[in-house]
Every structure is written in structure tokens, then in C-alpha cells.
Amino acid sequence: MSDFRFIFFGTPEIAAASLDALKARGMLPVLIVTAPDKPRGRGLVMTPSLVRLWGDAHGIPVLTPTKLSDESFVGEIAKIKADVFVVVAYGKILPEKLLSLAPRGTLNMHPSLLPKHRGPSPIESQVLIEESVEHVGVSVMLLDQEMDHGPILKQKKAVLSEWPVPASVLYDALGRTGAELLAETLPLWVSGDISPAAQDHSTATYCAKIKKEDGLLNLLDDATTNYRKFLAYDMWPRTYFMHEVGGKPSRVIITEAALEDGVFVIKKVIPEGRREMLYEQFLKNA
């Protein structure tokens, strides 16, 4: 087991994968902080995050604060006397009074090769923009008070046999790569065997939070652009186009598509209120 104490902040699957990698190398957090349970599904059943489930399964205390600045929560963190914090897709920015409680700082795994793709949607942004897999990867960095701005400890390029790929594929690939890189970097940082390197802020690029309407396609737009959007938004919000039914606009979700000889070819769709069908069948009935 590790000879240092750390608190882990994270919420989704990519964070749970990092916990698995840390555990495989003998590192378990003394505390986990994750998002509160959320209503999910048609029944709006209150559902814990995957990281909370991971913590419960491994007998690790879990906190689910609604406000990170709450004095009682900050007090709980202070009592732990952790050496270092680790953040993977937690979902909120840690305030300074929280960051100051970790003597060895706070490590963050960010799924892009910083300073490119700073922000909340780096995976989708890489699928939308990057021309080569050579520019796709993950970073382990130290957090500061600016978004994805702190110095870099280690980076690693993605291992993919083709490019571009759907965001869901990149999410899994970078989740695995990032988890291993984090597990490799954390003990090196705590022991003082690795030094941080400042980012070149002059080359930074930024990505925005994805909105539902980002998935709307104009089928007359550039074919490559539409195909990249189809790949980038395959998890959420998915790509769609509008079709008039009975004088009213109706959404048609694209479930399968390809870029063939420079043409964006739609293969399958789900018209609003109907089941998935071949695009040819949809056109016949449109």
C-alpha cells in the first residue's frame, strides 16, 4: 500500500477507471468525494455516481457535498490531513481554501494534450478538430485557480488504430491511458522524483460546454464537418436534423453514418416517436 494519504475527487466512469488503476498499484484513497445522487431514467430514480459505487464496494468513506465551499465540508477534509488530492472528472472547480489543504498539491487527469482543449468537453473537441491521432492524448497536471492552466507532470498520446473515432471510443481509450498515466505519476510526484513544466499558455485552445442544440445538423453543410459532429456527439446529445411532419418540425436522430468519397452518408435514423429504421426507408415514407 502507498505510504502517503490522498483524497480522490471524481464522478463518472472515467474516474472509476482511474481508481481501478490506482488500486492495482497499491494506492487507495483515504476518502472519496463525488457528486450527489441524481435522478435518472424515466422513473427519475435517485442514482449514485459510479465513483460512489466504487467507494462503497471498497469500503472507502464517500462524501457527496453540494457546495465545496461549505465550512462543514472543508472542515471534514481538513481533518483527514491528506498529503495530496487527485481529481478526475469531478465536475466542479475546487476552491482555493480546499486546494490549500493538500501540502503536495492537487493532481488532475485531463483527457487532452494540454494546453490544447482546455475546458469541459476535451474529448468531443478533439474528435471535432484534430486531423491526426498524433495530437490526441491525456495530461496529468497540477491544479491551480485557473481552468486547466497548471503545470504539466506527464503526458501520453492516445493509442488508436484509426482516426477519427466516435467520442465514446476515445472516451474509453483516454480513460484507460489516463488512468495508467495517473497511477504512474502520483507516486513519482509525492516522492519528489518528477518536476512540473509550465504550459505554453500562448498556444492554449479552449472548448465549451456542450449544449443539446449542438447536435443539430444542416445536411447541406460541409460533409466532413457533419461527419465529425456525428462522431463527436455520439454519446450526447447525438446528432439530428429537423423534418416537417404535419406542418410541425420533428427531430430525426442519426444513429449510423459514414463519410464515403467525401459525402456524408446517413445509414440509419430514429424519427421522433418511432423506431430505428434505414435512412432509405425514412426517405420513402417522408
Question: For each predicted feature, which ranges?
Answer:
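Short amphipathic alpha-helix with an adjacent loop that forms part of the alpha/beta core around
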Residues: E71-K81
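A residue-level signal for conserved active-site and pocket-lining positions in enzyme catalytic cores
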Residues: G10, I32, G55, F85, ...
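Glycine-rich, highly charged phosphate/nucleotide-binding loops
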Residues: L63-S72
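N-terminal beta-loop-helix "entrance" segment that forms/cooperates
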Residues: K38-D56
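An anion-binding loop in the catalytic cleft
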Residues: D214, L219-A286
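Donor/substrate-binding cores of folate-linked one-carbon enzymes
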Residues: F4, R25-L28, V84-A204
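Flexible, acidic loop-helix segments that line cofactor/substrate-binding pockets
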Residues: Q199-L217
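N-terminal Rossmann-like dinucleotide-binding module
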Residues: M1-R42
